[in-house]
Amino acid sequence: MEGETLPLAQYLFKRLLQLGVDSIFGVPGDYNLTLLDHVVPSGLKWVGNCNELNAGYAADGYSRIKDIGAVVTTFGVGELSAINAIAGAYAEKAPVVHIVGTPMRASQESRALIHHTFNDGDYQRFDAIQEHVTVAQVSLSDHRTAPSEIDRILLQCLLHSRPVRIAIPVDMVPVLVPVAGLSSKIQIPPAVRQPQAEEAALNAVLKRIYSSKKPMILVDGETRSFGMLQRVNHFIQTIGWPTFTSGFGKGLVDETLPNVYGVCTLHQKAFVDSCDLVLVFGPHFSNTNSYNYFLKPADEKSVLFSPNSIQVNKDVFRDLPVGYFIEQLTQQLDISRIPTHKHDLVHPSLRTLPEVSPTDLVTQTGGFWKRFSPFLRTGDIILGETGTPGYGVNDFILPPQTRLFKPATWLSIGYMLPAALGASHAQRDLVASDQYHSLSNPRTILFIGDGSFQMTVQELSTIIHQKLNVIIFLINNDGYTIERCIHGRNQAYNDVAPWRYLKAAEFFGADQDGEYKASTWEVRTWADLDRVLNDSQLADGKGLRMVEVFMERLDAPDVLMGLLNNQVLRENAQSRL
């Protein structure tokens, strides 16, 4: 290997392959075309998207399953098109590598007035913009340092679980660099243990555990980002305390455990308020992920487990590897001293469904979402789009080893359709390498509203082109129902154009009888829903399966109905003035 060389582009792509990227998303453009010539020779699969925004969303979805994803765009127009997706990945800690093909070094150095710029010779503006949504950036300009710079940036992506940007000029693509660097893998350096801080933190946490009377556990979404999942689940099983997740954390805990009660919502407010200790793993306290901070416990009754620190009350113990700390905490628990919390919580699996007539129209208030739990199975990847689906999926009881994406903080509507494309590709890549729960035909299931679907519908064509196995439940409630609940329930700005949604698959190239099938269903009544959920072609088939569910425009999950009712009260009060 000594003395051997390879093009810089292949060094970058082979590094991504080593880190677990098998498929790379993007859109070709004149500054990245020669770069893309090296994708397949490097061992990667190219997935071309309809636009850069969707490519970024897809890379984000891929990264949440495979722990890293990558997207390629062209300089300026392409990268700015993708920046919304990159910002969302930054906000919700998805490790995405954004690779940007840029003009030749000579053009940049001479400040040439060329296309995709502001025509003023300033090539640094886009670098500055990207600094706000990435944790590390580099523009490769020197073949001697380029490999080490690539390694440095990729390490930052892994270390912080957030996006990075690598810009590669056209004339740097073929530059030869040593192969030798690929012989050593990029790995997060092991944290140096801090024995005194560990002991102090363990003693502080154990003291709070043993002295509590009414404890609970909350698992939040940043648990996913830093390799804590297995240890957190073991801790929950060992201690046996009532456990909830945030919306962002749903799918990260085994919901079949008897002490796991699903997503903590305002319905559990009285219980949460009564607790004198809340252990929070991977906290992410945005207003939308915490029901306007209801889930954020007061300092005096909380222990927060963050990636590099433990906070007990107001005391913060820093530089502690949280995964190792949780393992030590579990081992040192004295079961005889752990308090039991007597409560009247009912496990979701024991809750009864409302009685409905088969001929009645389906409604979200009639237990619509709860009826999907028997349909779900081990290995499913489930996505609930911002809007009514994002709240509805809270009601699912997930089987073990199931993943669920739902809105947390960024809430860019339309994200989930391209994210389903990315997640399904990650699922396929894992199946191909026999790393996916020994399953050969797993499913990606998307729940999305009509308004969100219209935002990014083009990627349905990519799902079809890539022959992915995706199930889509499209909630047709005639517009932006979540916005109607917030404000303007009868305003035209919350309407969307009526589409023939079930014709979309045919328009985008699928057919009913070919190798890659697209199957469609329509649901209006409870009998329709029961029939569709028991259809083996939907549950066990392959290809694209799409179900259009018709609902009233002001039908929404409970939490949104509360907002709608408040809006009506305000309108009535205003009318009396």
Swiss-Prot record:
Transmembrane segments: none
UniProt cross-references to Gene3D superfamilies, sorted A to Z: 3.40.50.970, TPP-binding domain
Cofactor binding annotation: Binds 1 metal ion per subunit.
GO biological process per UniProt: aromatic amino acid family catabolic process to alcohol via Ehrlich pathway
Family: Belongs to the TPP enzyme family.
Sequence segments annotated as region (Thiamine pyrophosphate binding): 388-482
Binding-site residues for Mg(2+), renumbered to this chain: D450, N477, G479
Substrates-to-products reaction catalysed: a 2-oxocarboxylate + H(+) = an aldehyde + CO2
Chain sites annotated for binding substrate: D30, H116, E483
A GO molecular-function annotation: magnesium ion binding
Name of the protein in its database record: Pyruvate decarboxylase
Cofactor(s) required for function per UniProt: a metal cation; thiamine diphosphate
Keywords: Decarboxylase, Lyase, Magnesium, Metal-binding, Thiamine pyrophosphate
Lineage: Eukaryota, Fungi, Dikarya, Ascomycota, Pezizomycotina
This enzyme's EC code(s): 4.1.1.1
Gene name per UniProt: pdcA
Quaternary assembly: Homotetramer.
One Pfam family, short name: TPP_enzyme_M
GO cellular component, one term: nucleus
Record organism: Aspergillus parasiticus
